[in-house]
UniProtKB/Swiss-Prot annotation:
GO terms for biological process: proteolysis involved in protein catabolic process. This is ATP-dependent protease subunit HslV. Belongs to the peptidase T1B family. HslV subfamily. Its EC number is 3.4.25.2. The active site is at 12. Keywords: Allosteric enzyme, Cytoplasm, Hydrolase, Metal-binding, Protease, Sodium, Threonine protease. Pfam families: Proteasome (PF00227). SUPFAM superfamilies: N-terminal nucleophile aminohydrolases (Ntn hydrolases). The gene is hslV. The keyword Nucleotide-binding does not apply. It comes from the Bacteria.
Length: 193
């Protein structure tokens, strides 16, 4: 586990859920500096690109995350409608560029076809079940969403319930959520049902 640096803003919860032809990404609004809550209504989930066809959420150092979001937007311009390729190219840069290597953040990104997590270690990960979460409350939200995914609930309801559970457990997560939704292609599993 990385050493905790008190002068860097840590902690948040970001989750994405794919179900029923929708992809939903939700993030809390708390920004913490060490043990102090600095802001309660930050927007850590946003749309990218001119068309807004990609949604992204970040956890980690805020300035670092914004740098990575800008880089991802540039990659999306280079590789339009190719989220996986844009993310792989960003991950390569993030891993090999001397400046980018120092950035402390993680990102979740999604479009109508795919959801991916990007890390500073060069990882570009796709969830098996259409659910992925990052941040200090990520494991709580992920567990809750997986428990709810087979229930008769839509993607947004699952994301909200999972975020509420994370907010009740994780001290770095609050219940002021930003939620973005996209129409999504049905997964092969959903098509079979």
């Amino acid at each position: 586990m990385a050493e905790h640096k008190p002068d860097i803003m840590y902690g948040t919860t970001i989750i994405t859920v794919r179900k029923g032809g929708k992809v939903v990404m939700a993030g809390d609004g708390q920004v913490s500096l060490g043990q102090t809550i600095m802001k309660g209504n930050a927007r850590k989930v946003r749309r990218l690109g001119k068309s807004g066809a990609v949604i992204a959420g970040f956890a980690g150092a805020t300035a670092d995350a914004f740098t990575l979001l800008e880089r991802l937007e540039t990659k999306l311009e280079q590789y339009p409608d190719q989220l996986m390729r844009a993310c792989v190219e960003l991950a390569k840069d993030w891993r090999t560029d001397r400046y980018l290597r120092r950035l402390e953040a993680m990102m979740l990104v999604a479009d109508k076809k795919i959801t991916l997590a990007l890390t500073g270690l060069g990882d570009v990960l796709e969830p098996e079940d259409g659910i992925m979460a990052i941040g200090s409350g990520g494991n709580f939200a992920l567990s809750a969403a997986r428990a709810l995914i087979d229930m008769d609930l839509d993607a947004e309801t699952i994301a909200r319930k999972a975020m509420n559970i994370a907010a009740k457990i994780c001290v770095y997560t609050n219940d002021h959520f930003t939620i973005e939704t996209l129409d999504a292609e049905l997964s092969s599993l959903e098509k079979a049902i």
